[in-house]
Amino acid sequence: MFAHRSFSLLCRRSAVTSWRSQSHTAGKRLDISGIYPPIATPFTEPEDVDYQKLDDNIRKYGRLPFRGLVVQGSNGEYPYLTAEERVEVVKRVKQALPKDKLVMAGSGCESTRATIQMSQRMADAGADCVLVVTPCFYRGRMDSRALINHYSKVADSCSVPVVLYSVPANTGLDLPVDAVIQLSKHPNIVGLKDSGGDITRIALMVQKTRSQDFQVLAGSAGFLMAAYAVGAVGGVCALANVLGQQVCELAQLCVSGRWDEAKELQYRLIEPNTAVTRGFGVPALKLAMDWFGYHGGICRSPLQPLSKADLEALRGKFSSNGWL
């Protein structure tokens, strides 16, 4: 049986009594364990941000046992939003979300300077921590030295804790393990969201950072059980936008050591999860949200709606696993 950290609550914050030893104004140790949906951004037909529908979604998510929400992650279509829109969305989410839930705001930009500025704007907008994706346009030069320098400068400057974000499917770049190990020692870097799905890599990072106050989150519901088994403490899962209660249930089963039950539920989540992530992407996630009573709707161009064939394939992934 894998060694596993015990937690007292399903997806909610555990009591935090220690202080992180650091010189930064962020100061306080932040426990990020639990489940987070990386929320979508609703748009009107002219492709303006629909803040009323956003508020409706947040109020529904607020009733589920999430640890918090990730705002302006990949599923929020942040590359297609202006800087002002990104910040305003975070403000609206913070206002609508229950106070006991975290707002983890995506603040990554291509330059270190812009990332520092956006991170502070997100903190000022109410974010409890920032999620910083790897800069990737010049990915051939983004070696460990460059990335350690980038994240260290961001964390040095930010007034809230920083969470590293590795999403190679979108960036073409895996945050190197040696860089993660080095960055885990920074007093204002509290964890990592890893969306690559390499469980050996996740296990190695958990093992190598155990002496630090550092937490690893799975970046997908598709490998959530496996990530928990090797020491991850939660997940940022696109599928939780649609099947939030079920993803939280899977987390609870893992935390409780009920691995046989967890395995059966994990099986039923794999195909729907793949469909709304690598299979058909954000347009599929938003369509599935519509099916399950949330506001998904259209994407901002150039993302296009699913074809009829893809729509039927998406429906099949949910129905064949008993969700529709």
From Swiss-Prot:
Record flagged with keyword Magnesium: no
GO BP term (any one): glyoxylate catabolic process
UniProt transit peptide range: 1-22
UniProt keyword annotations, A-Z: Lyase, Mitochondrion, Schiff base, Transit peptide
Positions annotated to bind substrate: S74, N75, S195, G219
Name of the protein this chain belongs to: 4-hydroxy-2-oxoglutarate aldolase, mitochondrial
Catalytic reaction equation(s): (4S)-4-hydroxy-2-oxoglutarate = glyoxylate + pyruvate; (4R)-4-hydroxy-2-oxoglutarate = glyoxylate + pyruvate
Function: Catalyzes the final step in the metabolic pathway of hydroxyproline.
Gene3D superfamilies reported in the protein's UniProt record: Aldolase class I
Modes of activity regulation: Inhibited by divalent cations.
Main localisation: mitochondrion
Family to which the UniProt record says this protein belongs: Belongs to the DapA family.
Subunit: Homotetramer.
Enzyme class: lyase
Protein's cellular compartments: Mitochondrion
Keyword Mitochondrion: yes
Cellular component per GO, a single term: mitochondrion
InterPro entries with a match to the protein in the record: Aldolase_TIM, DapA-like, Schiff_base-form_aldolases_AS
Organism: Danio rerio
EC number: 4.1.3.16
